Every structure is written in structure tokens, then in C-alpha cells.
Swiss-Prot record:
GO terms for cellular component: cytoplasm; ribose phosphate diphosphokinase complex. This is Ribose-phosphate pyrophosphokinase 1. Belongs to the ribose-phosphate pyrophosphokinase family. Mg(2+) binds at residues 131, 133, 142, 146.
Amino acid sequence: MSTNSIKLLASDVHRGLAELVSKRLGLRLTPSELKRESTGEVQFSIGESVRDEDIFIICQIGSGEVNDRVFELMIMINACKTASARRITVILPNFPYARQDRKDKSRAPITAKLMADMLTTAGCDHVITMDLHASQIQGFFDVPVDNLYAEPSVVRYIKETIDYSEAIIISSDAGGAKRAAGLADRLDLNFELIHKERARANEVSRMVLVVDVTDKICVIVDDMADTCGTLAKAAEVLLDNNAKDVIAIVTHGILSGNAIKNINNSKLKKVVCTNTVPFEDKLKLCLKLDTIDISAVIAESIRRLHNGESISYLFKNAPCK
């Protein structure tokens, strides 16, 4: 059992997930203040001593504000480091720039590696994330990384809300096949893949379905929903092939650009996202949106890490609500 206490910190901008986690742990959020000067520079201060404490910084980053939130996070980490915190763990459920994990064209940067370098340079000792877009990002770090999975929480949601005896798990591309197949195995369901051809980024020109989905509840699973164009087209293809209903379940609801319009105008019955990304404002604009709360997973990972217990239990099991 660790003798130093847990201190939870969160940005002033998105505190929803941090507040849920703090309630589950029976802890208050450590007082802090983040101010933006007229010059655009950020000042951050911690309202009490964090010397020799176990710090957990919970950072939710919304769509369209990535760069500001990332730099604010670096300042928060460095403030804890210079205040002599014993250990600083950053909880980034949706890791920024995760899709830029390799050189996919000449002279392109590997920005996910830059993110890892920035976090460690700022003073981060440990990172907790969820459903990394590319698992090899863990290898970019010189500090420990725990990549949690939303799958156990998704399994619970499906069992509680869907007549899954009539369901089939769908992956909208080859990249998500492993994730969808794993979920299908957990539920003892069939898994199928939709082949998609892209004309350009975020734009799907053609989708091909090679299985019979007649009278099936099709559950499309993916790690993130951005503009939701792919999900909308997938739903159309599935329903044109006599599917009963189409539900999308994604870990990271980025919901950028015309996402809400695309969902509202689509044939999707429901789009379910975890709260790794803040999208409370969008819930009011789209009745098809639903949320899976992963605060229990984050809270339990904090408790286990602080007490020196294994986190691998959470890879296959969802904590009690």
C-alpha cells in the first residue's frame, strides 16, 4: 500500500470525466487555476502542496481544440514536476494525434511520437490511455503506458440494451477487424467485415457487403467516430441489404465537422460513444447519441496503480458501476 496520497488534477475546460472519477474514488479534485492572458499565453497554479504526492492528471480533449489543450496539459505536468510531486500519471483516454503514428508519405512527421516525447520532457512518469488507434504508439514512450480497453464496458452495454441474440458485429474496415472479432467472440456472435474504398481522407466512395444480414441487428464497432460519413454509408448499405437495425458503438466520439448532421440524416438507429471525449453539447443536438460511461474503469486503474496492483484485470473485465 502506497503511503503517499492521490491528488487528482483536471483542466478547467473539460472536467466532466474527472468529476465522475473523483466521486468514484471518494476524493476531491485538487484546487487549481488555469488562466489565459490577453497575449494568449497560459498561466497555471496549483492551490495546495503536491510535494511527494501521487499525481493523476485527467485530460479530456474535445474536437477542434487539440493544440490548446495539449499545451495546457504540458504546463500542468511541468507545474507538478517543479512542485516536487513523487509521480505524475497523465490520463489521456483519447490520445491526440494517434492517427499520425507513421510516415504515410514523403516528408511527413510522426506526430504521435512527438506527443510522446513532449509528455516525457514535460515530466510525465506514466500514461494511461484507452483504445489507442495504433497499439505501437506505446513503444514511442520511454515511460510506462497502460492502454485500457473499452471492450468490457461495450459488452456490458450490449447485453443490457440490445437483443443481441439477433445481432451481428460489423467492422466498417479492415483496420478494425481485430477489435470487432474480439467483441464478437466475447458475445458468441458472428463477425463480418465491410470493405470500403476511399477516394480521399474522411471520404468513402464505395462500400461492399459480402454477407447476409437479413433481419439482423447490425452493431458497427470502431475506435473513433470523426465526421461519421463512414458510419452513415455503412448503415445505408446494411439496411439496403435488409438488416433490421443498425447501431454504431465507438470508443472516441470526436464528432467533428458535419458529424451531427450526418448522424441525424443517416439511417443509423443509434450512435453510442464512451465519454473519453467530451460531447455533452452535441447530445442536445442529436437524439440518436448515447453514452457509455468509462469513469469506473479510469477510477479503478488509478486505485490499482496507486496501490501497486496489476491493471491487466481491467483489460477483460468492467468494474462495477
